[in-house]
Amino acid sequence: VIVGSGPDGPVVAHAPVLLAARTLRFHLSAANALCPVLRERPRALAVVTGPDAYVSPDWYAAADQVPTWNYLSVEAEGPVRVLQRVETAALLDDLAAHFEVGLAPKPPWTRAKMTPARFEAMLGAIVGYKMRVERLAGTTKLSQNKPPDEIARVAARLAERLDEGSRGIAALMNASDGRGLG
């Protein structure tokens, strides 16, 4: 999620991102409402979320508990600049390579599967951006305010669930040893 500061408040867009060192690259449809905002105020906040899961108060041994949500997220903030056309094409190649590897054993998609004219036409419909990350902050809520036995109990219940978010949070809770992740 990319957030810019519009004249009437925040403007939000969902976009695939690539982070390398302190640089975050992404692209948006040229028609996206965030594009003129970033042109006028070239600074953005990117929010990347990890696994998350609902925690039932019934899972605690202690009485008088409330429901909660455990999660992992990272925020990156900094100035953005519009990429040149050749840089945007490279970004698309890099994004495809990054995500296509997870689809193996299918052969990865590359722009070589498109006619150059069609690729160029589609490239003209997007705007690529590069953010220089000046601030990077992570937030975790993994029940670290609870005693170790309660954390273990909640992690065990989450691990029994079928959704990836619950299982991911359970693994992080077990790995953090009750301290959170920083």
Where are the regions a protein language model picked out?
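Short beta-strand segments
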Residues: 1-30, 46
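Catalytic micro-motifs at enzyme active sites that drive phosphoryl/nucleotidyl and oxygen chemistry
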Residues: 3-7, 34-35, 62-65, 118-119
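Pocket-edge structural micro-motifs
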Residues: 4, 28, 48-50, 133-135, ...
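Residue-level preference for beta-strand/loop junctions
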Residues: 9-11, 72, 125
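Short, solvent-exposed polar/charged micro-motifs at secondary-structure junctions
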Residues: 11-15, 56-58, 120
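Beta-strand secondary-structure signal
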Residues: 25, 45, 77, 128-132
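Short, structured beta-strand-loop surface elements
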Residues: 30-94
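C-terminal edge-of-domain segments
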Residues: 81-182
